[in-house]
Regions:
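Bacterial Sec-dependent signal peptides at the C-terminal "C-region" and cleavage site
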Residues: 1-9
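Divalent metal-binding segments
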Residues: 9-17, 22, 26-280, 300, ...
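A generic structural signal for residues embedded in beta-strands
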Residues: 43-44, 122, 512-515, 544
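Non-cysteine beta-strand/loop elements that form the S-adenosyl-L-methionine
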Residues: 78, 290-310, 399-409
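Acidic (Asp/Glu)-rich catalytic clusters
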Residues: 255-258, 283-293, 370-373, 394-398
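His/Asp/Glu-enriched, well-ordered alpha-helical/loop segment
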Residues: 339-349, 353-378, 382, 388-392, ...
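Beta-rich accessory regions
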Residues: 534, 538-540, 545-546, 552
Length: 554
């Protein structure tokens, strides 16, 4: 596959040989070796022809029977949020915490290291995994930290819990009205409990000490290291500014301009930060982006989360039939913003979990007319409860999707038994139905909502197995190669980057990963247990699990 190099051609910077190369090109080509030069794939072929290209300065990576695939493209993640969670003084997740009292103990321990009045942040709490089966309140946190404001962020990012000191700092009282698109939870006397729902969480964020570019840059570098460890070479940051506002953009540009961020970033600015959008005249994308960072998309959040009962459903929640969730923007306003962004040249990515929200998003996109030729590839994020009729409309209108496939494993049991009931739950992330209609879609982990590993997401798409070991909608499973494409070439398509990344083809970026085994050849149940052994970006080995075997690199 590929012509032998002529003698005058410069030696490649990298040669990879001795294993299996899954190119994921249109023909499903396989090879045993490849060469990269100047950051791009230069040759693909057999061991003998590729080895002959190596020169004195060539890095030679011996696969020793392992498998190379294109670098994973994460089509929906939150690197700043992820990095802040990694650096946070309180890990509020489950595991390690079984009860709210365990989280309170961690807050108490952290408070010993903070001066009076300093903010203590925690991330990843999940009420659905706690034995208490509820959100913490200020009454749980106050004894652990009476002098320090505390803010715990839910694993979904759709809720926060503040202690009394934090509520005082921002001035939230019984008289504070609920903000548009959010709610302040209150007790029977009307006093805030500390739980802040959806946009209400932004009220506390505004009172916290501002996070400057340096702090956010450090968080991004923490996330960057974890991405490389898991074979992620490109990330769609779907919500730049959600954590640090405009300072996030400054942090990205600072890092990428200095070459200190190795993962390639395709950014979607949070819509509230775009000048002119509220007035219907948004600024257009800035074409001047530093190498490794592109931002020509805007993120809008239409509803909340199913497990938080804020995802907007056409039929009520199984556990509370009168509850339908909430829209964070009214449908008419959502459509108005979509139209204004499209006219200004932006790609639009709208978060939609509940089917009522998905209806509103499709309506907004459908009003734009035929999408052919614009190249903007407007998207629905998560698209969790899409019905068959909605998938028909998505196909008709050229609407793409990024499916949060790991919902099946992490929350599938509760979706079936608590939130959605068996019939709706078996259809979450309907990949097979979407694929049968030719809908373009990627797969994602929404980190830090779920752990990074794309191999786990690929397994979820193939196995449709919940955390209790039960199958959930096995008819919506897809095959291994299709799932691999959902984390590579099909994810690249969502950002309009399929011509430069997502498959191993001559001329494309040399973004590659080495897997311990061929995921298309092992028992599907083992896919999530495979390891990423090395990550290559632009032809450079940027991470490896263990030293390359003797003679394997020089």
């Amino acid at each position: 596959v590929g012509e032998p190099a002529v003698s005058a051609r410069p030696a490649p910077d990298l040669v990879v040989l001795g294993g299996t190369v899954l190119t994921l090109d249109r023909g499903g080509t396989r090879a045993s070796a490849l060469a990269a030069r100047d950051g791009r794939i230069a040759e693909i072929g057999d061991d003998r022809s590729i080895a002959a290209l190596a020169g004195p300065g060539t890095t030679v990576l011996d696969l020793a029977g392992r498998t190379v695939v294109p670098g994973f493209v994460e089509s929906h993640n939150h690197p700043s949020f992820f990095g802040m969670a990694l650096a946070a003084p309180v890990d509020a997740g489950s595991p390690p915490n079984d009860r709210i009292s365990d989280i309170a103990d961690r807050v108490r321990q952290a408070a010993r290291d903070f001066g009076p009045g300093e903010w203590i942040k925690g991330f990843r709490y999940d009420d659905t995994l706690l034995a208490d089966n509820r959100h913490p309140t200020r009454h749980d946190l106050d004894p652990a930290s009476p002098r320090n404001p505390v803010l715990l962020t839910h694993v979904t990012g759709h809720f926060s819990v503040a202690n009394s000191a934090a509520l005082r700092a921002v001035g939230i009282t019984a008289a504070t009205p609920d903000p548009p698109g959010g709610a302040i939870a209150r007790d029977e006397r009307g006093e805030p409990t500390g739980l802040l729902i959806e946009t209400a969480a932004f009220l506390v964020n505004s009172a916290m000490p501002s996070q400057g570019p340096d702090e956010l840059a450090a968080a991004l570098q923490l996330a960057d290291a974890e991405y490389l460890r898991n074979g992620v070479t490109s990330v769609h940051d779907t919500g730049i500014g959600l954590i640090g506002g405009e300072q996030e953009l400054a942090a990205y540009r600072m890092l990428t301009s200095a070459g200190k961020l190795r993962t390639r970033i395709h950014g979607y600015l949070f819509h509230t930060l775009l000048p002119g959008l509220a007035e219907g005249a948004p600024e257009s994308p800035d074409p001047s982006n530093p190498d490794g960072f592109t931002m020509n998309g805007i993120k809008i959040v239409a509803d909340g989360s199913i497990q938080g009962r804020t995802g907007c459903l056409a039929e009520g929640y199984t556990c509370d039939p009168d509850e339908h969730g909430m829209m964070l923007l009214e449908p008419d306003e959502l459509s108005r913003r979509i139209a204004a962004l499209d006219a200004a040249g932006w790609q639009v990515a709208v978060h939609g979990n509940g089917d009522a929200a998905i209806d509103a998003i499709i309506d907004g996109y459908a009003r734009l007319g035929a999408p052919e030729g614009t190249g903007r590839r407007h998207r629905i994020e998560h698209c969790q409860t899409a019905r068959e009729d909605q998938l028909d409309r998505m196909a008709e209108n050229g609407i793409a999707a990024s499916f949060f496939i790991k919902h099946v494993y992490y929350w599938g049991d509760r979706h079936r038994d608590v939130f959605l009931g068996p019939e709706r739950a078996r259809r979450i992330s309907p990949l097979a139905s979407a694929r049968s209609r030719g809908i373009h879609f990627g797969l994602h982990s929404d980190t830090p909502v779920t752990p990074v590993p794309p191999l786990e997401g690929i397994w979820c798409a193939v196995a449709r197995q919940t955390s209790s070991g039960q199958l959930l909608g096995p008819e919506q499973a897809i095959d291994v190669e299709a799932a691999l494409r959902g984390y590579t070439i099909d994810a690249a398509y969502l950002a309009g980057e399929e011509e430069s990344k997502g498959s191993i083809e001559v001329g494309k970026l040399a973004d590659l990963i080495v897997l311990s085994e061929d995921p298309t050849a092992v028992d599907p149940s083992r896919i999530r247990d495979l390891t990423v052994d090395a990550t290559v970006i632009g032809g450079r080995l940027v991470w490896q699990r263990d030293p390359v075997p003797a003679g394997g690199a020089r």
